[in-house]
Amino acid sequence: MPIKPLIILPDPILRQVSKPVERVDAPLRKLADDMLATMYDAPGIGLAAIQIGEPLRMLVIDLAKEDETPAPHVFINPEILESAEARSVYEEGCLSIPDYYAEVERPASVRVKYLDRDGKLQEMEAEGLMATCLQHEIDHLNGVLFIDHISKLKRDMVVKKFKKLAKDKAPGKLVG
């Protein structure tokens, strides 16, 4: 299970809309395993395939704490069927926007349908942190980042910072 490099803001790949998975097979399950390994290594609690450069509608989530047994979830072609009117606020971060966190308001619970890693149709009622993670990762599949849910001023500052970091890391840049 190789660790994959993460796509970092401002890479335009993060703004792509991911394509539906057409077949759940061994290579797709291998990709899910690689995504989990990458997420655990980062460390993080959720990862969308687009974050490792694979524009497929697949994501992984594991909310188990470090001292708990891992409880990985694989969601293929996830779709939000219902969102609660009640809202909740969580401080969100993203492996593709390292070291930046902001409070984001989202529906407090969601009902999601998806295929599991065996290709079986499943439904999940999620609330709390799982609901927030599902919405955050499904946003990735639609080219939406959590910073799109904060004020334009804050978002512009974050994007500017990451563009500067990317420029400073560009090949051929002299360090002196």
UniProtKB/Swiss-Prot annotation:
Principal EC category: hydrolase
Gene Ontology molecular function: metal ion binding; peptide deformylase activity
Disulfide bonds: none
Biological-process GO terms, alphabetical: co-translational protein modification; translation
Annotated coiled-coil segments of the chain: none
CDD domains, per the entry: Pep_deformylase
Cofactor binding notes: Binds 1 Fe(2+) ion.
Cofactor: Fe(2+)
Family of the protein in this entry: Belongs to the polypeptide deformylase family.
Stored InterPro entries: Peptide_deformylase, Peptide_deformylase_sf
The protein's name: Peptide deformylase
Record keywords: Hydrolase, Iron, Metal-binding, Protein biosynthesis
Organism in which the protein naturally occurs: Mesorhizobium japonicum (strain LMG 29417 / CECT 9101 / MAFF 303099) (Mesorhizobium loti (strain MAFF 303099))
Listed Pfam families: Pep_deformylase
Gene from which this protein is expressed: def
Function recorded in the entry: Removes the formyl group from the N-terminal Met of newly synthesized proteins. Requires at least a dipeptide for an efficient rate of reaction. N-terminal L-methionine is a prerequisite for activity but the enzyme has broad specificity at other positions.
Its EC number(s): 3.5.1.88
UniProt: Fe cation binding residues: 94, 136, 140
Catalytic center residues: 137
Reaction(s) the record says it catalyses: N-terminal N-formyl-L-methionyl-[peptide] + H2O = N-terminal L-methionyl-[peptide] + formate
